[in-house]
Amino acid sequence: MIKVHYQDDQENLMEACSGVMNTLIETDRGVKSAFSDLISREVMEQFRPDKDHFLIHSTAMGDQETYGPNKNGDGWPKEALARKHQTFVTNGHFFREHRNRDPKLKIGDIKYAAYSPVSEGGMGRVELLKWGHRKLAEEEYEMAKEGKELCFSMSARVPLDVCSCCEHKAKSASEYC
Protein backbone atom coordinates (compact mmCIF):
# COMPACT_ATOMS: atom_id res chain seq x y z
CA MET A 1 0.00 0.00 0.00
CA ILE A 2 1.31 3.47 -0.86
CA LYS A 3 0.52 6.36 1.48
CA VAL A 4 0.86 9.94 0.24
CA HIS A 5 1.63 12.86 2.52
CA TYR A 6 1.64 16.53 1.49
CA GLN A 7 3.53 18.94 3.70
CA ASP A 8 0.63 21.37 3.94
CA ASP A 9 -1.83 18.60 4.94
CA GLN A 10 -0.61 18.69 8.54
CA GLU A 11 -2.22 21.94 9.69
CA ASN A 12 -0.71 21.99 13.20
CA LEU A 13 2.78 21.57 11.74
CA MET A 14 2.13 24.33 9.19
CA GLU A 15 1.10 26.62 12.03
CA ALA A 16 4.22 25.73 14.06
CA CYS A 17 6.36 26.60 11.01
CA SER A 18 4.47 29.87 10.42
CA GLY A 19 3.35 28.46 7.07
CA VAL A 20 6.90 28.18 5.70
CA MET A 21 7.76 24.56 4.96
CA ASN A 22 10.51 25.05 2.36
CA THR A 23 13.27 27.62 2.17
CA LEU A 24 15.92 28.24 -0.47
CA ILE A 25 19.34 28.41 1.18
CA GLU A 26 21.76 30.62 -0.75
CA THR A 27 25.24 29.14 -0.31
CA ASP A 28 27.20 31.13 -2.90
CA ARG A 29 29.15 32.95 -0.19
CA GLY A 30 29.28 30.14 2.37
CA VAL A 31 26.92 29.16 5.14
CA LYS A 32 26.84 31.80 7.86
CA SER A 33 24.60 30.16 10.45
CA ALA A 34 22.49 27.13 11.25
CA PHE A 35 19.08 27.08 9.65
CA SER A 36 17.34 25.34 12.52
CA ASP A 37 18.16 23.73 15.84
CA LEU A 38 18.16 20.39 14.03
CA ILE A 39 20.39 21.28 11.07
CA SER A 40 23.62 22.92 12.15
CA ARG A 41 25.85 25.24 10.17
CA GLU A 42 28.39 22.40 9.87
CA VAL A 43 25.78 20.03 8.42
CA MET A 44 24.67 22.67 5.94
CA GLU A 45 28.26 23.30 4.92
CA GLN A 46 28.80 19.55 4.49
CA PHE A 47 25.85 19.37 2.07
CA ARG A 48 26.58 22.61 0.26
CA PRO A 49 25.59 22.05 -3.39
CA ASP A 50 27.84 22.19 -6.42
CA LYS A 51 27.34 24.80 -9.17
CA ASP A 52 24.67 22.72 -10.94
CA HIS A 53 22.40 22.47 -7.89
CA PHE A 54 20.61 24.61 -5.32
CA LEU A 55 19.81 23.81 -1.69
CA ILE A 56 16.33 23.65 -0.16
CA HIS A 57 15.64 23.16 3.55
CA SER A 58 12.30 21.39 4.05
CA THR A 59 10.22 20.57 7.07
CA ALA A 60 8.89 17.30 5.70
CA MET A 61 6.48 16.07 8.35
CA GLY A 62 5.75 16.05 12.04
CA ASP A 63 5.00 13.08 14.23
CA GLN A 64 1.32 12.36 14.89
CA GLU A 65 1.73 12.53 18.67
CA THR A 66 2.83 16.18 18.46
CA TYR A 67 0.97 17.48 15.40
CA GLY A 68 -1.89 15.05 14.89
CA PRO A 69 -2.82 13.39 11.60
CA ASN A 70 -2.91 15.01 8.19
CA LYS A 71 -6.13 15.94 6.36
CA ASN A 72 -6.55 12.31 5.24
CA GLY A 73 -6.36 11.07 8.82
CA ASP A 74 -2.90 9.60 8.20
CA GLY A 75 -0.09 10.05 10.68
CA TRP A 76 3.41 8.86 11.28
CA PRO A 77 4.24 7.81 14.85
CA LYS A 78 7.32 9.36 16.45
CA GLU A 79 8.88 5.91 16.83
CA ALA A 80 8.59 5.31 13.07
CA LEU A 81 10.03 8.72 12.17
CA ALA A 82 12.92 8.26 14.61
CA ARG A 83 13.71 4.85 13.15
CA LYS A 84 13.00 5.48 9.46
CA HIS A 85 13.78 9.15 8.69
CA GLN A 86 17.03 8.17 6.93
CA THR A 87 14.98 6.37 4.26
CA PHE A 88 14.27 9.82 2.82
CA VAL A 89 17.97 9.83 1.82
CA THR A 90 18.42 6.15 0.99
CA ASN A 91 15.15 5.64 -0.94
CA GLY A 92 13.86 9.11 -1.75
CA HIS A 93 14.29 11.56 -4.59
CA PHE A 94 13.13 15.09 -5.34
CA PHE A 95 10.29 14.92 -7.90
CA ARG A 96 7.84 17.38 -9.40
CA GLU A 97 4.07 17.00 -8.98
CA HIS A 98 4.07 13.47 -7.61
CA ARG A 99 5.74 11.93 -10.67
CA ASN A 100 7.61 9.62 -8.33
CA ARG A 101 7.64 6.15 -9.85
CA ASP A 102 10.67 6.50 -12.14
CA PRO A 103 13.95 7.82 -10.66
CA LYS A 104 14.86 9.03 -14.17
CA LEU A 105 12.19 11.75 -13.71
CA LYS A 106 13.74 13.17 -10.54
CA ILE A 107 14.66 16.86 -10.45
CA GLY A 108 17.02 16.51 -7.51
CA ASP A 109 18.05 14.44 -4.52
CA ILE A 110 17.48 14.35 -0.80
CA LYS A 111 20.93 14.71 0.75
CA TYR A 112 20.23 14.82 4.49
CA ALA A 113 17.39 13.90 6.86
CA ALA A 114 17.08 14.40 10.61
CA TYR A 115 14.35 13.85 13.19
CA SER A 116 14.12 15.81 16.43
CA PRO A 117 12.21 13.98 19.18
CA VAL A 118 10.15 16.14 21.52
CA SER A 119 11.44 13.99 24.40
CA GLU A 120 14.92 15.43 23.73
CA GLY A 121 13.72 19.03 23.49
CA GLY A 122 13.13 18.85 19.74
CA MET A 123 10.18 19.79 17.58
CA GLY A 124 8.95 16.26 16.75
CA ARG A 125 9.52 16.69 13.05
CA VAL A 126 11.65 15.53 10.12
CA GLU A 127 13.76 18.12 8.34
CA LEU A 128 15.51 17.59 5.01
CA LEU A 129 18.22 19.17 2.92
CA LYS A 130 17.49 18.70 -0.78
CA TRP A 131 19.53 19.48 -3.83
CA GLY A 132 17.49 20.63 -6.81
CA HIS A 133 19.08 20.52 -10.24
CA ARG A 134 19.21 24.10 -11.56
CA LYS A 135 18.04 23.05 -15.05
CA LEU A 136 15.65 20.21 -14.24
CA ALA A 137 14.06 22.08 -11.31
CA GLU A 138 14.32 25.54 -12.84
CA GLU A 139 10.66 26.34 -12.12
CA GLU A 140 11.03 25.45 -8.43
CA TYR A 141 14.31 27.38 -8.20
CA GLU A 142 12.78 30.54 -9.68
CA MET A 143 9.74 30.28 -7.40
CA ALA A 144 11.98 29.85 -4.35
CA LYS A 145 14.14 32.84 -5.36
CA GLU A 146 10.96 34.93 -5.60
CA GLY A 147 9.98 33.85 -2.08
CA LYS A 148 6.98 31.82 -3.28
CA GLU A 149 6.03 28.84 -1.16
CA LEU A 150 6.84 25.43 -2.56
CA CYS A 151 4.89 22.37 -1.51
CA PHE A 152 6.13 18.84 -1.97
CA SER A 153 4.53 15.48 -1.39
CA MET A 154 6.06 12.37 0.04
CA SER A 155 4.95 8.79 -0.30
CA ALA A 156 5.86 5.56 1.41
CA ARG A 157 5.15 1.90 0.96
CA VAL A 158 3.57 0.56 4.10
CA PRO A 159 2.57 -3.05 4.83
CA LEU A 160 -0.87 -2.03 6.10
CA ASP A 161 -3.04 0.85 7.21
CA VAL A 162 -4.41 1.05 10.76
CA CYS A 163 -7.79 2.70 11.40
CA SER A 164 -7.41 5.51 13.93
CA CYS A 165 -10.91 4.77 15.35
CA CYS A 166 -11.08 0.99 15.75
CA GLU A 167 -7.47 -0.05 14.98
CA HIS A 168 -8.62 -2.38 12.16
CA LYS A 169 -5.63 -3.32 9.99
CA ALA A 170 -6.10 -3.17 6.22
CA LYS A 171 -3.60 -4.29 3.57
CA SER A 172 -5.51 -2.47 0.82
CA ALA A 173 -8.24 0.15 0.53
CA SER A 174 -10.79 -2.59 -0.20
CA GLU A 175 -10.26 -3.86 3.38
CA TYR A 176 -11.03 -0.50 5.04
CA CYS A 177 -13.72 -0.58 7.72
Task: Set out the residue ranges of the language-model regions.
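Signature of dsDNA virion morphogenesis modules
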Residues: 1-177
